[in-house]
């Protein structure tokens, strides 16, 4: 059992935006009236941050106090301080004909940090629920001349290109995350990735990274490819998309068997108030039985007003070999699994060979705030999860679970 749990924990490092399928995380699209021409990017160093807290009530009151298959909202019936984030950033100035440089340094303290650590960087800082982490620390360079818009090169630690959701809660429509975000994509990478702005419609991304959630140290001393292709301004500006991938050895102490993580995300504006987001995901690990996971998540977002939106998310994700989806009872289980260590907490279990389905309905309320605050978002949601074959939920005794969650994100 411990061996299987360790594999599942190693696979956890695939999870989530991401983070989001783009060179720099951008908000999950919300319908809006077309905006005027964009202002020049701010110059100089910008300082900003946010605080997020929330709670998830499980109707079946699990004795182990775990919401199976969840990460950032994993604790049942408990208030969580998810994130306290501070950021210093100098963005590129938006002048493609000039050489430019920028950077981003972002730190986090909170319960979410347990899941997004990278090897060798604060991964042993604490065994408490609230932990510190360096989310991003990179140098950004713009090189002109290769094309009309030039090329950007990011060097350091950064969030993944993959996925429709992000670590940053401000860019997500829901408090809870998909199985795709949690188990089907990485959270972060350390290395270098270049973005070639080939045309006004196409970006090409390519680079080498230390792997899934690996930073100053690596669990197999191998490099991986990370890249993709972005599509913009299609269908009269209504359609954007991104295919992203990561390929390389990811299992602890194994530099021969590859892991393949592919994600395809599309966003389509139905109208000024409505949009659809599609996230397709496939993951395979060649170690052992060649475990596979794959699925789709679909989002519908309706903007009622400038302060209120309604959103619905449906997802189906198959864990073909019972390798990827799990719950983690101990605060150190994720990092121990990433390092290839045995997991002994009996609350840390997988869900077996099954297909998961989930439907989530929620609101996003953004009331006005006074300076120096820059935003407040309150997101209540109702979510139903089901396993097709196994009793994965609620102390491993039920095939489904119903949860009500709510969080608040205060930005400054």
Can you say where each PLM-predicted feature lies in the sequence?
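Surface-exposed coil loops of outer-membrane beta-barrel proteins
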Residues: 59-78, 113-230, 240-247, 327, ...
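Short loop/turn motifs that connect adjacent beta-strands in outer-membrane beta-barrel proteins
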Residues: 24, 31-47, 60, 92-101, ...
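Solvent-exposed loop/turn segments connecting transmembrane beta-strands
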Residues: 96-97, 183-189, 214-222, 251-258, ...
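Transmembrane beta-barrel architecture of outer-membrane proteins
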Residues: 80-85, 100, 106, 132-136, ...
């Amino acid at each position: 059992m411990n061996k299987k749990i360790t594999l599942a924990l190693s696979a956890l490092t695939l999870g989530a935006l991401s983070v989001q399928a783009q060179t720099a995380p951008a908000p999950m699209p919300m319908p809006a009236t077309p905006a005027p021409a964009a202002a020049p990017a701010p110059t100089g160093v910008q300082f900003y941050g946010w605080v997020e807290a929330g709670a998830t009530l499980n109707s079946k009151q699990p004795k182990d106090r775990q919401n199976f298959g969840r990460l950032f909202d994993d604790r049942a019936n408990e208030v969580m301080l998810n994130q306290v984030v501070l950021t210093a950033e100098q963005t590129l100035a938006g002048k493609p004909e000039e050489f430019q440089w920028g950077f981003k340094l972002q730190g986090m303290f909170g319960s979410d940090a347990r899941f997004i650590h990278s090897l060798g960087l604060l991964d042993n800082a604490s065994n408490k629920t609230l932990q510190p982490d360096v989310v991003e620390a990179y140098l950004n360079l713009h090189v002109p001349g290769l094309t009309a818009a030039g090329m950007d090169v990011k060097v350091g630690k950064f969030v993944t290109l993959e996925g429709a959701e992000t670590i940053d809660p401000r860019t997500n429509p829901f408090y809870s995350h998909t199985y795709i975000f949690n188990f089907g994509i990485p959270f972060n990478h350390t290395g270098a990735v270049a973005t070639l702005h080939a045309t006004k419609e196409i970006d090409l991304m390519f680079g080498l990274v230390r792997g899934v959630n690996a930073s100053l140290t690596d669990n197999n001393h191998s490099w991986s490819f990370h890249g993709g292709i972005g599509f913009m301004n299609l269908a009269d500006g209504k359609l954007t998309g991104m295919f992203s991938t990561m390929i390389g050895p990811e299992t602890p102490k194994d530099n021969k068997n590859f892991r393949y993580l592919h994600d395809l995300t599309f966003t389509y504006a139905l109208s000024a108030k409505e949009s659809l987001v599609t996230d397709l995901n496939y993951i395979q690990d060649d170690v052992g039985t060649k475990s596979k996971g794959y699925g789709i998540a679909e989002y519908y977002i309706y903007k009622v007003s400038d302060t209120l939106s309604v959103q619905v998310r449906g997802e189906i994700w198959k864990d073909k070999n019972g390798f990827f989806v799990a719950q983690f009872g101990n605060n150190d289980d994720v990092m121990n699994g990433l390092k290839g260590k045995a997991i002994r907490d009996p609350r840390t279990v997988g869900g077996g060979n099954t297909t998961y389905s989930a439907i989530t309905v929620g609101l996003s309320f953004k009331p006005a705030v006074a300076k120096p605050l820059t935003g407040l978002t309150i997101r209540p949601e109702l979510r139903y999860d089901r396993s097709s074959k196994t009793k994965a939920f609620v102390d491993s005794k039920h095939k489904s679970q119903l949860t009500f969650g709510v969080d608040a994100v205060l930005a400054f």
